[in-house]
A protein has these predicted regions:
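Catalytic nucleotidyl-transfer cores of nucleotide-processing enzymes
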Residues: 278-367
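Detector for glycine-centered tight turns/loop "hinges" at secondary-structure junctions
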Residues: 276, 289-291, 377, 477
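Generic signal for short, ordered secondary-structure residues
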Residues: 91, 95-98, 112-116, 123, ...
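Short, flexible segments with low predicted structural confidence
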Residues: 108, 115, 306, 373-375, ...
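Generic detection of long, well-ordered alpha-helical segments
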Residues: 102-109, 122-126, 321-332, 336, ...
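C-terminal anchoring/interaction modules
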Residues: 1-67, 136, 144, 150-157, ...
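Extended, helix-rich architectural segments
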Residues: 1-279, 396-397, 415, 487, ...
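Short intrinsically disordered coil segments
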Residues: 160-163, 192-198, 327, 369-371, ...
Length: 605
């Protein structure tokens, strides 16, 4: 390299845009501000996936044994299983509620619910929600956004374009890939920056195949020109800049000489000081922390970025929430400490320390071994204090406390608690054990899933083609139909509501109360029963048990079905009687010998 190149700086090569540099600085500042939080989450992850204590904080202890009891992991799996069961109790997880008569019409409601149910099933919505639930438990924070997918595959032999999935999709955002202002009034009002690492080929494909993304090709050429300059440079050619850091790469030179590119997507409002212009709800994409490759108004109709966040335990004046496992790490540390201390104590009992006094011949420690000692020689076994063997009791106490504090008691996992219980007590304990699950899942539904589903519907209205075919099951005839849905069919005033945890808890409580009432003397009192509508109770149970689609409840259906059964029984009895009846009388035939007719053979009638 020529001597004139030596001493160059990154800024002289990159020539960063002022706005891009400002966004990059905000990303670095917000990322540094959460390092303590990230260290705490890293410790939790080490305990969750540990196979022994050598990879956890317990490695600092002096114990010889390194057994790890995965209590934290077991609580995590239990919470995830219960959250998933509460969020998706049936195959119809959503319901459309219109804000006017037209939006609440049956055809409109059917089209919207069928379209969204079909897209949720095809796009793997439950799988993505499952991933977000793990973030909800592990990090205490879950993030997601809707995207519109139009997949196309090319047949390698014929060259034919085969259409794939077309429609909205929920996309999980890793809590480690998004930064925001943690002291903002709300997450919706905070600026957000999402970091991603793409290959140069994928970025070029987005520019060529997806013009709707509005990436600027001239900026991509500038990015490639920068990499061509770095291809022939080494560290001795210019001064190192500590300000440029890319996570996942050893240094900036390795990054620029690789096939990867860092992309930062900024969502929010910003004020341009040079021109005095205010930009509201803007989407700005920068690459290499230096160049703006996209700067457009956010295309959604909601007025804010379609990025949604939910926290497990919210903090005052801090948008980073706590998780259910945060307060349990210390107890997990204590459990592993007691387990390995107890194991070392057992080892000292089986292989005790020996104190040798005087002249003692060498011997091998084992059963039946003879030890020869001198006149004043002796071998004394140093027995440890056996109090440590009671550590199992303390471990059980800590495990029970961890389950209770995380809201995951043993009865919620199917383990029976000690003591005799009546049926009412069992039901009461079950409801109490599920209360914290239903509370958290109802909050998850209201704050996270509901706005996310409505945003998926909004992005479908903006991007879908002339029409789409959705699969619908006809409950009357038990056949599958395909409904043609247009953009107008899914355009209405109203909102989608998840009908999982909140409705499941309410319905289960009402059914339990009704069952207990009818089992009591009050419900069996004729004076009370005379004033209770049987039709209303039937319709209520049909709604609570989610049986409307089977049409089990109809006015006086039991009476008509009973009459129909009786008619069939009478018709069957009549047919049987006619079949078993004797033959009729035969007509008399006159003989040739007598002029009198012959007597009838059958009985007289």
């Amino acid at each position: 390299m020529a001597s004139g190149v030596r001493g160059m700086t990154l800024d002289s090569i990159l020539q960063p845009d002022a706005l891009a540099a400002k966004i990059a600085v905000n990303y670095d500042n917000w990322n540094m501000a959460r390092q303590v939080w990230m260290d705490q989450k890293r410790e939790i992850r080490n305990y969750l996936f540990a196979t022994d204590t050598t990879t956890t904080t317990n490695s600092q202890l002096p114990w010889k044994n390194s057994t790890h009891i995965p209590k934290l992991c077991q609580i995590r799996d239990n919470l995830h299983a219960n959250y998933t069961a509460a969020l998706f109790p049936n195959d119809r997880p959503i319901k459309w509620e219109g804000d006017d008569e037209t939006s609440e019409a049956l055809d409109k409601r059917t089209s919207i619910e069928a379209y969204m149910n079909n897209k949720m099933r095809q796009s793997g919505f439950r799988t993505e929600i499952s991933k977000c639930l793990y973030d909800f438990i592990d990090y205490g924070n879950a993030f997601a956004m809707p995207v519109f997918i139009a997949e196309k595959n090319v047949d390698g032999v014929t060259g034919e374009i085969i259409p794939g999935y077309v429609g909205p999709k929920m996309e999980r955002i890793s809590p480690l890939d998004i930064v925001f202002n943690p002291v903002a009034a709300s997450f919706a009002e905070s600026h957000k920056i999402i970091r991603s690492i793409k290959t140069l080929a994928s970025l070029k494909a987005d520019i060529d195949d997806h013009p709707e993304m509005k990436y600027m090709e001239d900026v991509f050429k500038k990015v490639m020109n920068t990499r061509h300059q770095f291809a022939s440079l080494n560290h001795s050619d210019f001064n190192k800049s500590n300000a440029f850091q890319v996570d996942g790469f050893t240094d900036y030179l390795t990054y620029f000489q690789s096939d990867y590119i860092e992309v930062l997507d900024f969502y929010g409002d910003y004020y341009e000081q040079e021109t005095g212009k205010f930009y509201k709800n803007q989407l700005i994409t920068i690459v290499d922390k230096s160049h703006i490759i996209r700067n457009i108004p956010n295309p959604n109709w909601l007025g804010t970025a379609s990025i949604f966040h939910v926290g497990w335990r919210t903090r005052p004046d801090n948008l980073y929430a706590m998780g259910p496992l945060d307060n349990l790490v210390g107890m997990q540390y204590r459990i592993d400490h007691l387990e390995n201390a107890k194991a070392d104590a057992f080892d000292l009992i089986v292989h005790p320390v020996m104190k040798i006094r005087g002249m003692v011949e060498d011997f091998d420690y084992g059963p039946g071994e003879r030890i020869f000692v001198g006149d004043e020689g002796d071998v004394i076994f140093m027995s440890p204090d056996t109090t440590m063997l009671a550590a199992d009791t303390q471990i059980q106490i800590y495990e029970a406390k961890m389950e209770e504090m995380a809201g995951a008691p043993k009865q919620a996992m199917g383990f029976r608690t000690p003591g005799e219980k009546t049926a009412f007590e069992v039901q009461t304990l079950e409801n109490s054990a599920n209360r914290i699950f239903l509370n958290k899942t109802a909050y998850f539904e209201e704050v996270f899933m509901e706005p996310l589903l409505n945003s998926m519907l909004e992005i479908s209205r903006r991007n879908m083609g002339p029409s789409d075919l959705v699969r619908v099951l006809d409950n009357d005839f038990a056949v599958v139909n395909f409904l043609k849905v247009t953009r107008e069919d899914i355009t209405a005033r109203g909102k989608l509501r998840p009908i999982g945890a909140r409705h499941f808890a309410r319905n289960a409580n009402i059914v339990q109360n009704l069952t207990q009432m009818y089992s009591s003397s009050l419900g069996q009192d004729p004076a009370v029963a005379a004033h209770v509508s049987g039709k209303a109770i039937a319709h209520l149970m049909e709604e609570l048990l989610d049986l409307e689609r089977f049409q089990l409840v109809q006015d006086n259906i039991r009476v008509s079905e009973t009459l129909e059964t009786q008619q069939l029984a009478q018709a069957g009895s009549q047919m049987l009687a006619e079949r078993n009846a004797p033959a009729g009388p035969e007509m008399a035939v006159p003989t040739a010998n007598s002029g009198t007719p012959a007597a009838p053979k059958g009985p007289a009638r």
